[in-house]
A protein has these predicted regions:
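Bacterial N-terminal signal peptides that target proteins for export
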Residues: 1-11
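C-terminal motif of bacterial Sec signal peptides marking the signal peptidase cleavage site
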Residues: 18-20
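Acidic, Ser/Thr- and Gly/Pro-rich intrinsically disordered linkers and low-complexity segments
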Residues: 229-240
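Structural detector for internal amphipathic alpha-helices that build alpha-solenoid repeat scaffolds
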Residues: 23-35, 45, 53-67, 72-76, ...
Length: 285
């Protein structure tokens, strides 16, 4: 009798799974046929299906369809117990750019494993600046080393898209106070960081910190600096040109020698002196 009950239970589970699979397949078919609203409603109804595989497909479908209903429906699934499904919920909240979920996603950063960290990074990258500003603020305001480290790891995982938001932290602080911020920029190891930070060389409040940040970026800052110096020949902002010249010297960038030499006969003595100093740093004589 006990064996019969067990078999019945298994049969019911299989039937439920089959029903769920059939429903999600129908929803996906409707979506392919262009019946987006009907497909969305069916997918939303399957977000709490008993099968994690069905829930996973439902989350992906809701994210693909998008629209006003998608964000709130996905946000409700932030309590998902299956790790893989939850990561997909996180990614798709970013995909549909549902802003009311940003703070909840930021909360998750402090208790994330490496897989969830990547999912959160994908989401914040999709959201863009409004969400990145939130994690930059959390990183900057935290007094607890563990929490601060968690947000630091998330910022690094997000990548060069953080450059604009994090550059604002450099203002009014010493090199020592900004050491963690410089470390974030260095660890991203992407030339785009340098390109995105270039406009801040014209900001007197933060320019010297940006010069230091470029030094920390190392070889990842060389090409962007050379390109910026080339453009400066037309704009003629002497202070920005001088800073770019200094950066090439600090980086000991041999690739920049030709560009520096093109500035060696500049009308400004200040520029000529900066070129001489940078060439000395690069060549050693």
């Amino acid at each position: 009798m006990r064996a019969i009950r067990k078999n019945i239970a298994w049969i019911m589970l299989i039937m439920l799974f089959a029903v769920g699979c059939s429903s999600i397949e129908k929803a996906e078919s409707l979506y392919r046929q262009g019946e987006k609203q009907e497909a969305l409603e069916m997918a939303i109804s399957l977000l709490d299906d008993d099968s994690p595989k069905v829930r996973l497909r439902a989350v992906k479908l809701v994210g693909s369809i998008g629209g006003p209903q998608a964000g709130p429906a996905l946000h409700e699934r932030i309590v998902e117990t299956d790790g893989r499904v939850l990561r997909e919920v996180v990614r798709n909240l970013g995909k549909v750019k549902y802003e009311p979920a940003i703070e909840d996603l930021a909360d998750m950063a402090t208790e994330s494993n490496s897989d969830m960290l990547r999912a959160l990074a994908d989401a914040f990258r999709e959201y863009g600046k409004p969400a990145i500003d939130v994690i930059v603020s959390r990183y900057d305001s935290s007094n607890q080393s563990g929490i601060r480290a968690a947000y630091k790891d998330l910022l690094i995982a997000v990548g060069p898209e953080i450059a604009d938001s994090i550059s604002k932290l450099l203002k009014g602080r010493s090199f020592f106070e900004n050491r963690d911020t410089f470390d974030i920029l260095r660890q991203i190891k992407n030339p785009r960081v340098a390109t995105l930070m270039m406009p801040y060389l014209a900001d007197e409040e933060v320019a010297e910190q940006v010069v230091e940040a470029m030094r920390n970026l190392g070889s990842n800052a060389i090409e962007a600096t050379i390109n910026a110096l080339q453009k400066q020949k037309k704009s003629g902002d002497l202070l920005v040109s001088e800073r770019l010249i200094r950066i090439l010297g600090l980086l000991k960038a041999k690739q920049g020698i030709e560009m520096l030499e093109s500035y060696s006969q500049h009308d400004s003595e200040r520029i000529r002196n900066a070129v001489e100093q940078s060439l000395f740093q690069i060549r050693g004589f």
